[in-house]
Amino acid sequence: MGQKVCAHGFRVGPTLIKGWDSVLYAEKHYKTLFIQDLKIRDLINNSFNQAQISRVLIERPSNKSIIININAKKPNVIIGRSGNEIDKLKKAIEKMTYLQEVYINIHEVRKFNIDAAIVAQTIALQLEKRVSFRKAMKTAIQASFKQGGQGIRVSCSGRLGGAEIARTEWYIEGRMPLHTLRADIDYSTAEAITTYGVIGVKVWIYKGEYTANKRYN
């Protein structure tokens, strides 16, 4: 049943490859802050879905400040003209968290073809545009190897091609050592809203093995 384990959650920890998406300390108000983090992520992802956001990291160094790091394929969509969009986002977060010190950092994802979240979103976008699911999956696989990926697995589930009966189809190329803890495996999901219903997309990308001199966040 090892394939059923989330590749991210399996590797989260200070001595492993993956770090936490939320960094905070709270004894009594953990639940409130956790819900705030979920709302902030939903706000960012829903407001800037065209930016193809990979990851939203939220840090709370103190009770009075919050630092939000956004990794995206198209950072200009989030920033907007003369920084208008990011100012609106900052005010919305200030209103939501009641904090005056809100810092937002935008980072561009350069190797987006080996970023599982962006690859999954790209495939979902193509499915919504009625591109063949097989073509979308094979294109993503080829692009990932060109940017240094060592293995990729892509899965699509739903009424593929408008079929009456839902099914799951997947392709795998290269290595995918899901049981190896030192393996750097990126995993993400996305949904394509089509006229036939929702199609789920899952992507696993193997980038190589973790070494003592190299840590992925």
Curated annotation (Swiss-Prot):
Sequence similarity: Belongs to the universal ribosomal protein uS3 family.
Protein name: Small ribosomal subunit protein uS3
InterPro entries in the cross-refs: KH_dom (IPR004087), KH_dom-like_a/b (IPR015946), KH_dom_type_2 (IPR004044), KH_sf_prok-type (IPR009019), Ribosomal_S3_C_sf (IPR036419), Ribosomal_uS3_bac-typ (IPR005704), Ribosomal_uS3_C (IPR001351), Ribosomal_uS3_CS (IPR018280)
UniProt xrefs under NCBIfam families: rpsC_bact (TIGR01009)
HAMAP family referenced in this protein's UniProt entry, alphabetically: Ribosomal_uS3_B (MF_01309_B)
Annotated keywords: Ribonucleoprotein, Ribosomal protein, RNA-binding, rRNA-binding
Stated role: Binds the lower part of the 30S subunit head. Binds mRNA in the 70S ribosome, positioning it for translation.
GO biological process, one term: translation
Top-level taxon in the UniProt lineage: Bacteria
Residues in KH type-2 domain copies: 40-110
Entry GO CC: cytosolic small ribosomal subunit
Pfam families registered for this protein in UniProt: KH_2, Ribosomal_S3_C
Subunit structure: Part of the 30S ribosomal subunit. Forms a tight complex with proteins S10 and S14.
One GO molecular-function entry: rRNA binding
